[in-house]
């Protein structure tokens, strides 16, 4: 059975890095019975830090030692095939998907997760779990082989969702940008995840998790946006 935890963000307000979701991750690993297993960490989205720095930051902030970064393995694809749990950190989704394709890992990760290997990721790691990465918020742009992503969650994900416009900003709001995506991709569904929310996938069902009563938005072409409350579940 597919098991995944897709987190909108690594931080929530001023709680600090991974602090708001640390217990969610702990519970997820325990529920999936991999608490004592090694988690394969994929740091490729971390443009601003080295792979070693990213790995150590996650170990320190999660206070969890059973993490090994994929860059330390001589054969990345074999590391995925043998992984007991997989984690992808946030950062730049373009760079992340570029390297996942470069090392031929996209299909390997998808197959492992479909076979029941637990997967969790935040920000770019949640975005890339969707059907494509085309609702990312990211710059700079580095061209991956394809925008098709892991398809663990068979729809679009927009992490770090924030509603409305910043005072003095004359560009499009996030809602407007996502509506534009739907105009040119009319069969797609977008799930917009505010910071502090997550999707917990079990098989073909998903449940919204959240720090507060901040709903996930389900957006479809020429349809009214649906608000999915924390604690509610839906079919994939």
How should each PLM-predicted stretch be described?
Residues 41-42, 48-93:
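A glycine-rich, hydrophobic loop/mini-helix early in the fold
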Residues 102-116:
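Catalytic-core regions built around general acid/base machinery
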Residues 2-34, 46, 51-53, 135, ...:
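C-terminal and late-domain segments of enzyme folds
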Residues 93-103, 167:
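Glycine/threonine-rich flexible loop motifs
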Residues 81-82, 115, 152:
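Alpha-helix C-terminal capping/helix-to-coil transition sites in glycosyltransferase folds
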Residues 87-90, 113-132:
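Catalytic nucleophile loop
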């Amino acid at each position: 059975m597919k098991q995944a935890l897709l987190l909108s963000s690594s931080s929530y307000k001023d709680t600090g890095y991974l602090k708001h979701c640390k217990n969610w991750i702990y519970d997820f690993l325990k529920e999936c019975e991999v608490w004592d297993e090694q988690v394969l960490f994929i740091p490729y989205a971390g443009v601003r830090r080295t792979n070693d720095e990213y790995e150590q930051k996650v170990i320190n902030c999660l206070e969890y030692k059973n993490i090994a970064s994929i860059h330390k393995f001589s054969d990345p694809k074999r590391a995925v095939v043998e992984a007991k749990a997989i984690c992808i950190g946030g950062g730049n989704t373009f760079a992340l998907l570029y390297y996942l394709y470069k090392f031929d890992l996209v299909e390997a990760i998808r197959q492992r997760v479909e076979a029941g290997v637990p997967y969790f990721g935040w920000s770019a790691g949640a975005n890339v779990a969707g059907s494509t990465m085309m609702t990312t918020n990211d710059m700079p742009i580095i061209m991956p082989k394809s925008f098709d992503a892991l398809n663990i969650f068979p729809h679009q994900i927009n992490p770090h969702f924030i509603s409305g416009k910043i005072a003095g900003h004359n560009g499009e709001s996030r809602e407007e940008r996502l509506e534009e995506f739907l105009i040119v991709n009319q069969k797609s569904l977008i799930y917009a995840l505010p910071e502090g929310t997550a999707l917990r996938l079990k098989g073909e069902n998903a449940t919204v998790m959240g720090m507060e009563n901040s709903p996930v938005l389900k957006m479809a072409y020429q349809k009214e946006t649906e608000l999915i409350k924390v604690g509610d579940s839906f079919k994939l």
